[in-house]
Structure formats: structure tokens, C-alpha cells
Amino acid sequence: MPQLDTSMWLLTILSMLLTLFVLFQLKISKHSYSPNPKLAHTKTQKQQAPWNTTWTKIYLPLL
């Protein structure tokens, strides 16, 4: 059975990581962020669940 040649694996993995790093840096650098972001206040409406408005009876299981 022939041996698997692993001499190039380190170079392949390192070049892949370097390429991914460069690609992500280019992708992130294209985003434009506003220098002064302002929070938008949104009103949250509390939704009423049916069991909050009516009384429900919970039974214990028979032992």
C-alpha cells in the first residue's frame, strides 16, 4: 500500500487560511459605517395571550 504524501498539506492549509483572511478583510473593508449611529426608539406592544385574560384551571395528574 503506497504512503500518503503529506508534505504539501501545511503549505496548502496555510495558503488557504491566508486567502480566507484576505478575502474577509476585503469584504469587511467595503462596508461603510455611519460615524454617529443614533438609536431608534421603537414602541413595543404587549400582546395579550388568551390565557392571560381568562382564568384557567390546572389539574394535577392522578397518582
From Swiss-Prot:
It is found in: Mitochondrion membrane. The modification N6-acetyllysine is found at residue 57. Coiled coil: none annotated. Keywords: Acetylation, ATP synthesis, CF(0), Hydrogen ion transport, Ion transport, Membrane, Mitochondrion, Transmembrane, Transmembrane helix, Transport. It is a single-pass membrane protein. One of its GO terms (molecular function) is proton transmembrane transporter activity. GO terms for cellular component: mitochondrial membrane; proton-transporting ATP synthase complex. The chain crosses the membrane at residues 8-24. It comes from the Eukaryota. One of its GO terms (biological process) is proton motive force-driven ATP synthesis. InterPro entries: ATP8_mammal, ATP8_metazoa. Subunit 8, of the mitochondrial membrane ATP synthase complex (F(1)F(0) ATP synthase or Complex V) that produces ATP from ADP in the presence of a proton gradient across the membrane which is generated by electron transport complexes of the respiratory chain. ATP synthase complex consist of a soluble F(1) head domain - the catalytic core - and a membrane F(1) domain - the membrane proton channel. These two domains are linked by a central stalk rotating inside the F(1) region and a stationary peripheral stalk. Component of the ATP synthase complex composed at least of ATP5F1A/subunit alpha, ATP5F1B/subunit beta, ATP5MC1/subunit c (homooctomer), MT-ATP6/subunit a, MT-ATP8/subunit 8, ATP5ME/subunit e, ATP5MF/subunit f, ATP5MG/subunit g, ATP5MK/subunit k, ATP5MJ/subunit j, ATP5F1C/subunit gamma, ATP5F1D/subunit delta, ATP5F1E/subunit epsilon, ATP5PF/subunit F6, ATP5PB/subunit b, ATP5PD/subunit d, ATP5PO/subunit OSCP. Belongs to the ATPase protein 8 family. This is ATP synthase F(0) complex subunit 8. It comes from Balaenoptera physalus (Fin whale). The lineage of its organism: Eukaryota, Metazoa, Chordata, Craniata, Vertebrata.
